[in-house]
Amino acid sequence: MTNDPFSTDERRALAALTADFTAKEIAPNLNDWEDAELIPREVHKALGDAGLLGIGYAEEVGGSGGDSIDVTVLTESLLGAGASGGAFASLFSHGIAIPHMIDAANRRQVAGDDVGADWLLDENIRPVLAGDKIAALGVTEPDGGSDVVHLRTRAIPDGDDWIINGAKTYITSGVRADLFVVATHTPHSGSSRVSLFAVDTSLPGFEVT
């Protein structure tokens, strides 16, 4: 007889916590959120306080630990308790944004750039996993969809800064996000490579329409 990796004490507790949270805080409010076309930010904070936003992310970056099986348990429990696919995608949009930032922070640490790594971790990654900020991934564009080879968004160096020009569309959490991971081309990347920039949505020139 083999052990079921999905049925450990810890994962049963995670499933119960997730199902209870969903039944109390998400499922009863879905129709109201649909009518308002917005999920309150307080729900993100509550998920962060419960440790659910951090499942699958290492504790040293502000996560709750766990692996892909824990993420699967979380997802199945949340949807099984009545959350819609749209609510799940919106509440966990960081799942397609934060991994890129963690990778960048790790690379900066290896390169000896502790300032850059600390900025990514302390100003972006940890606040998102705590539910204090909302993150989104900006790839899809109005004309070319998600064809990254033909991205029209460009990032041009300007002294110590970068100027980004372009438009994104159909971005999950796009109207609520505090930070974007934006896919661009740069003068050095060419069309075969994509450069990702962490962009604070409060910066001048950033608009949501």
Q: Model segments located where?
A:
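C-terminal helix-coil-helix/basic helical segment that borders enzyme active sites and/or dimer interfaces
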Residues: 27-38
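A short core secondary-structure module
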Residues: 165-207
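A non-catalytic, amphipathic alpha-helix used as a structural packing/dimerization or gating element
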Residues: 10-24
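A short, Trp-centered hydrophobic/proline-enriched beta-strand micro-motif
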Residues: 131-139
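Intrinsic disorder at enzyme termini
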Residues: 1-12, 155
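Buried hydrophobic positions in well-ordered alpha/beta secondary-structure cores of metabolic enzymes
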Residues: 22, 51, 58, 74, ...
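Internal helix-loop-helix
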Residues: 49-122, 126, 130-131, 173-176
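Cytochrome P450 C-terminal beta-domain/meander region
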Residues: 147-165
